[in-house]
Amino acid sequence: MDLIETINAVVELQHRVRNLSPNTNIYQDGQTTINDYNAIASRCNGKVYNLRDQIAQLSPFQVHMPVIPISTILSTDDHETMSAGIESLFDVLAAAIRTEGSRQNRAVVTKSIEPEVLKAVLDIGIRSQFSENPYANMLQVDTAKMEQQLEPIDDPLASQRINMLAAGGATNNTGGGYHALVGRATGKTGIITIIQGRPGAVTFNLNMKVPCSGVLSLTLLPAPGVIQLSLGNQPPNNIPVHAECVDVSTVFTEGDIVIRFELAGRVVGNANKLGTLNFPLCDRISITIEPWNANKQNNANANFNNWPAGTAQRQPTISLFVNIINASSLIDYETHSKYLAGATYLMGTTFSEDSFIASPPNVVWTMSSLLSGAPPQYIHWTRKIACMIAAFSCKI
């Protein structure tokens, strides 16, 4: 989009100006920066644009960008004038975002529609397709002008409830005869308790929001003493089982767990131990775990009497803590990353919802909601707003 590309170029120029140091000799790069600044100043200085202010009123925004004389040494006054001039330009661009963002669009747009915004874009006259915030580049991705960027993400795991109740043979009211799972997974963390009320391994899956790779940590937590099991396929008015559990992590060994990393249903890697693992590109982690077995039963406590028959008084239990330390994936509208925070902060200050004369209804005013949480009829509108704010968030 032309406004986003203009913001990108002005952000880049601001960074170059900030990299200059006053009262020192200016070399070729510094001279180029001053020339680029002067080119914009000669076109924009003194011009007035009627755009939306922070209370959504049309107000005159005047650009104050005096031309800087070319010299071998940049004075402190000239450096401060350049910095203030670019800030004046950012005031206009922020108002342009509020103005253009208030206009609804039903498809991906590449050109500003508001006449005053288009006038400002043409007067500034510089553009750059690339932003340091990958969310600002998503409209370029949508129009096939750019590939998705590979970046660290904050929420590789899909939010899911990991509940299972599988009876086998005889059962009792303390969890005997059941294979059960009770757990949750979201963001980078999953915590799952495995109750093994009869022989046999238990398998469960952790699904990724998007295919990713990174570093994974698995460790054991103290298991609860009593836990209410899910009803599984039983009628909702059934009385749930309260499993009486014994933490058997003291005898848990490498052979008791198998971790498989899957991509599109195909196993691409595996491991059979706890600890820290570098996992390959995958969209699912499948874990098979067996807290207790026949060999361990040979010297079992009396609480585990008749465990093979499913009628033990207490059940072997393990609580597994899964933590994805870091993960990288192609940035998409639904992925969360560190780049959301700064833009969302601006949505509470410079770009509050009240500063837009019209905003998408039934949408929480955060970057995540604008990018992926809007109704289908508003999604292109909300993404336009989000991408513009994301580009602006890269300014110093």
From Swiss-Prot:
Family classification: Belongs to the rotavirus VP6 family.
Main location: virion
Function: Intermediate capsid protein that self assembles to form an icosahedral capsid with a T=13 symmetry, which consists of 230 trimers of VP6, with channels at each of its five-fold vertices. This capsid constitutes the middle concentric layer of the viral mature particle. The innermost VP2 capsid and the intermediate VP6 capsid remain intact following cell entry to protect the dsRNA from degradation and to prevent unfavorable antiviral responses in the host cell during all the replication cycle of the virus.
Classification via InterPro entries: Rotavirus_A/C_VP6
Record note on quaternary structure: Homotrimer. Interacts with the inner capsid protein VP2. Interacts with the outer capsid glycoprotein VP7.
Keywords assigned by UniProt, alphabetized: Capsid protein, Intermediate capsid protein, Virion
Domain of life where this protein originates: Viruses
GO biological process, one term: fusion of virus membrane with host plasma membrane
One GO CC term, this protein: viral intermediate capsid
Protein name, per record: Intermediate capsid protein VP6
Gene Ontology MF term list: host cell surface receptor binding; structural molecule activity
Keyword ATP-binding part of the UniProt annotation: no
Organism: Rotavirus X (strain RVX/Human/China/NADRV-J19/1997/GXP[X])
Compartments in which it is found: Virion
